[in-house]
A protein has these predicted regions:
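Redox-cofactor binding/interface segments in oxidoreductases and associated redox assembly factors
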Residues: 27, 90, 211
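Extracellular/periplasmic Venus flytrap/periplasmic-binding protein
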Residues: 74, 126-213
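Cofactor-binding loop segments of dinucleotide-utilizing enzymes, especially the Rossmann-like FAD-
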Residues: 30, 65, 158
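Gram-negative bacterial Sec-dependent N-terminal signal peptides
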Residues: 1-19
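Short gly/pro/ser/thr-enriched loop/turn and capping motifs at secondary-structure boundaries
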Residues: 117-122, 136
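Loop/turn elements at helix/coil->beta-strand transitions in domains of secreted/extracellular proteins
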Residues: 22-23, 55-59, 83-87, 106-110, ...
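Beta-alpha junction/loop-to-helix N-cap segments that form part of ligand/metal-binding clefts
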Residues: 24, 37-44, 52-119, 187-194
Length: 213
């Protein structure tokens, strides 16, 4: 009985001590670089967040990963080691989000993934992917293509994880919706011209073009 009383007292004391502890949310975004058109708006939204969360004080620490996956991983580790983040959020690009999720799993802290990244194993154990799966997202596109009588579909997208996800989603949806994928053209996020890819794409005479960018 005495042990139970002491244990209960210790638990109550710890609860009281942590009741008003600051919650630190570490965020890495592509505020600059190729993904800035999305990252800037995410940053602006985070800056509007309140100072409390569930009645507890909260602080959002936002770092710029310049839309680079390597920087995103470095930011994630910095947020954990230096800012003592309780949870991670990011990034606005799939490749960067994947790298962050791996860092979160290493540190064994939860992460909210802001892109439809495909994760597995221990990495998925520590992460929650917020957006809908890419295949569900692209099913609406496939439905529209079918409704407009499209048969031949050209594809052009990023030469990274996101471009792969969109293309694979269209591959899986092609047969059920009566579509034929006739191209798989790619370009880097930093490319300033895609003239060559577009010319090759148009030479196949597609009825419509899907852009995974």
């Amino acid at each position: 009985m005495k042990f139970r009383i002491i244990a209960a007292a210790l638990a109550a004391g710890l609860a009281a001590a942590t009741a008003h502890a600051e919650i630190v949310v570490g965020v890495s975004l592509g505020i600059t670089g190729p993904g800035a058109s999305l990252g800037v708006h995410y940053r602006n939204a985070f800056q509007l967040m309140g100072k409390t969360l569930g009645g507890e004080p909260v602080r959002f620490v936002i770092l710029d990963d310049a839309s680079d996956p390597t920087n995103a991983a470095k930011n994630a580790r910095k947020l954990v080691s230096e800012e003592k983040a309780d949870v991670l959020m990011g990034s606005n690009g799939v490749p960067s989000a994947v790298q962050m999720a791996q860092a979160a799993a290493e540190a064994k802290i939860p992460m909210l993934v802001m892109t439809p990244a495909v994760l597995s194993g221990n990495v998925l154990h520590w992460s929650f992917v917020v957006p809908q799966p890419t295949e569900l997202m692209m099913s609406a596109v496939a439905e529209q293509l079918k409704a407009h009588g499209v048969k031949r579909v050209g594809y052009i997208g990023y030469s990274d994880t996101w471009g792969d996800l969109v293309y694979k989603a269209m591959q899986s949806l092609a047969k059920p919706y009566g579509l034929e994928l006739v191209t798989d053209e790619r370009y880097a996020r930093s490319d300033t011209s895609v003239t060559g890819q577009v010319l090759r794409l148009m030479s196949t005479n597609p009825d419509a073009i899907v852009v995974g960018g």
